[in-house]
Curated annotation (Swiss-Prot):
Site feature (Transition state stabilizer) residues: 16
Record's keyword annotation contains Cell cycle: no
Species in which this protein is naturally found: Burkholderia cenocepacia (strain ATCC BAA-245 / DSM 16553 / LMG 16656 / NCTC 13227 / J2315 / CF5610) (Burkholderia cepacia (strain J2315))
Protein family membership: Belongs to the 4-hydroxy-2-oxovalerate aldolase family.
Coiled-coil residue windows: none
Pfam family, one: HMGL-like
EC class (word): lyase
Name of the protein: 4-hydroxy-2-oxovalerate aldolase 2
Domain Pyruvate carboxyltransferase: 8-260
Binding-site residues for Mn(2+), renumbered to this chain: 17, 199, 201
Amino acid sequence: MNSAEKKLYISDVTLRDGSHAIRHQYSVDHVRAIAAALDDAGVDSIEVAHGDGLQGSSFNYGFGAHTDVEWIAAAAQSVKKAKIATLLIPGIGTTHDLRHAFDAGARVVRVATHCTEADVSRQHLDFARELGMDAVGFLMMSHMTTPQKLAEQAKMMETFGATCVYVVDSGGALGMNEVRDRFRALKAVLKSDTQTGMHAHHNLSLGVANSLVAVEEGCDRIDASLAGMGAGAGNAPLEVFIAAAQRQGWNHGCDLYRLMDAADDLVRPLQDRPVRVDRETLALGFAGVYSSFLRHAEVAAGKYGLKTVDILVELGRRKMVGGQEDMIVDVALDLLKRQQPIMSDAH
């Protein structure tokens, strides 16, 4: 693709996926400052919500410091050009929640399902279109199905009204050829005017590389976050992707140096756990585990005296997917029983 001619759509996810990295504790002031900086730097959209989307604030996923509506309103009041986006996972968020997000200023919604469950997105995509929102399909854990089956799910979202469908590497487990194959499969079945997007995670340090490959295959929208702020080892770092895109001569519309300043001055200082590739986050990518399981698994490991890596690898072996955070404690207890067979006999 000649991206010098085609403008890439840059979708920032610092204030949604990045919420996972700090257990959903962004203050309203953080949101205002980060949204304003992103707007000044020229991104096209800024996604805002609890890490698990609208109404994700719960015992299962972790309580947010504020409501989604409070965060969205703060961001909407802080931008002049960028659109405010949000994320909705059917079964967590409802059309009622989407209406409130719209009223607060959200104009883009990404309706997120597991990569084989696009059928549950219909109601929410329909409603988004009724509201006049940009309705986007978001196929999570895209490494867990074949390119052809993923394309079938993308086509389903298109028929439900999605104007763009994303390949979402929630586990940061896809290699570059696997990304290439998925985009080729999607392009083969989607209408020419239906856009595609790439949402990468950096667990195998391929977040930027996979995003570049996606663009080479005709991808229209790229998700990224300041300093990679996101679940697991984070997303494709926005400032790094923009630097790489600029060296390719691609048209991205962003101010690289403003992004670099925002990443280091506003976002990195908020990290209570470094967002990076390390023993635990590498295990996520290697085992193909949902990236937002990281902080939950670390808590369980500390509580039960286990290694986080062991919990993550077992979650991968069991093919757990987003939404099954409650199973992390079950897995930890099972591992504990294996380590202490005498104790298990006493139950």
